[in-house]
């Protein structure tokens, strides 16, 4: 395939590292009764904000923000082991997402990387 068949577009990728046990602060009684996991809320908000892609990846071994090394046991989930919420879109839209949801993202490890989005003709 030659490059004439590929349309390139500059995008960005955010990687937000959080722990699976992190919850969204309850705003009312209904939310207190039904706990909301932060990673699910971030994906929901990404969809509402029309970002092109949102994915969640579970890690198996590692650490984040200088914390202790954790591993995932086959039989038991480790609520302290980091997971990654990955968002892809234009840099400006990712910046707007971070500003809009700053209360949820404050204190989290967030990595931005420029990427190319390819469409095949």
Show where each model-derived region lies:
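Positively charged, small/polar-rich N-terminal and surface patches that mediate targeting and assembly
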Residues: 1-121
């Amino acid at each position: 395939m030659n490059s004439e068949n590929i349309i390139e577009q500059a995008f960005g990728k955010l990687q937000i590292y959080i722990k699976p046990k992190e919850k969204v602060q309850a705003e009312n009684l209904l939310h207190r009764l039904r706990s909301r996991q932060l990673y699910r809320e971030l994906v929901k908000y990404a969809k509402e904000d029309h970002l092109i892609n949102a994915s969640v990846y579970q890690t198996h071994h590692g650490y984040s923000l200088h914390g202790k090394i954790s591993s995932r046991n086959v039989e038991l989930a480790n609520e302290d082991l980091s997971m990654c919420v990955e968002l892809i879109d234009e840099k400006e839209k990712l910046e707007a997402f971070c500003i809009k949801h700053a209360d949820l993202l404050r204190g989290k490890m967030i990595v931005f990387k420029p990427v190319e989005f390819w469409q095949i003709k």
